[in-house]
């Protein structure tokens, strides 16, 4: 039973037959009653605790209302925040995919370019290393390689164009990397803000008494309404206890006033009473006004037995008043602890809300101010790479065409060597036929000459000289002439470098390595080793092509 209940029960239990009634034979002195009055007045200082209880209830109710609002706002922001974070990381993934895909394609194209350029350089080196045989060139000319017949300006211009495309792509890639790095810095800042958010949530989970708090992003508000109800109950009980103390004080005042010489003492003691207090919607009567009314009210006649009963109740209640004061102090201590718990939960919710607001503001700033730039940079790189990719592919095709052209030049030179060898072989066959034919014609000529001379000797004296003018002539002679060939059908025109000359006699001395222009056509005389090397290279190319 509470102290207030005990104090009230004591008032009801007192009566003429109670033990206190047995003490009625010896009425207390005025000093004793005054001491009880002073103690009762001192106990009324508990009104400060009741005031504080009222403040606690008001603060707790305000904290609960604020917590509900904060929790609702935080929940709304968290849902939007989660969606924005998913969208943000999706955008970052897409931007990174653009960078990786472009980098991979660029690396692949560069590898193909390096391969094509290395192949072209190798072909050009082969042209430099291949010296045109001196028999193909005018006498006295400095040695020349096949590379001397190639105009490399086209190659250099193509390489310059490719370098420009590569530099522009590298510049766009560097700008995208810088943009992505800034994007990552933004994400790192958001992660730090999220770290603060998680710390606040972790603190809320660790301080929550709910069994599922550790798995919840936000602390539950379910414990706060019961705590507020507990505070209201404490405040109400404290008001009731204070009211019982006031009643005890009024009883002391009445007893003192009914004691001879006590009126002045009562007015002196009750001259500085505290004001009234309102707790949980109900008001404690104005103490000062009540005491003033009690002091100034005329004394009702009181029998000795009634007076004795009043004194007995006063003495019994005086013994319990200290317990009532202690209970009020205990309750205010509990209320302070409960309020601290409520405010702590409110502060945790507020810290989560502030952390959420921080992340949300950061995301909003990023989305409106900087994110469009990061996305635009990715689009810019895609556009630049698309343009330069087409140019580089075109340049790659041109490099391949040039390499095919120069490689064809090498192959054609080897073919030229074999063609010269073939023509010389044909010339040799022609010369052989010519020699054999001339030898037979010479034989026929000698036989004809001898036969004509024999006829002249044997029959000439009998034939008149004018019978046939040709009877004394030698046989006709046949002479071979070398005539330069014309231009092959479809071949480009060129200036002839030899005049039609009569054929040399078989016994005439032969010319040097190359036939002279007197023979109608110049066919270089190539070493056998040169022809064999050219044939070997052509066969090797044919094997590679298969």
Swiss-Prot record:
GO terms for cellular component: Atg1/ULK1 kinase complex; phagophore assembly site membrane. Its main location: cytoplasm. One of its GO terms (biological process) is piecemeal microautophagy of the nucleus. Residues 312-341, 424-447 form a coiled coil. It is found in: Cytoplasm; Preautophagosomal structure membrane. Residues 1-26, 204-225, 487-527 are annotated as: Disordered. This is Autophagy-related protein 17.
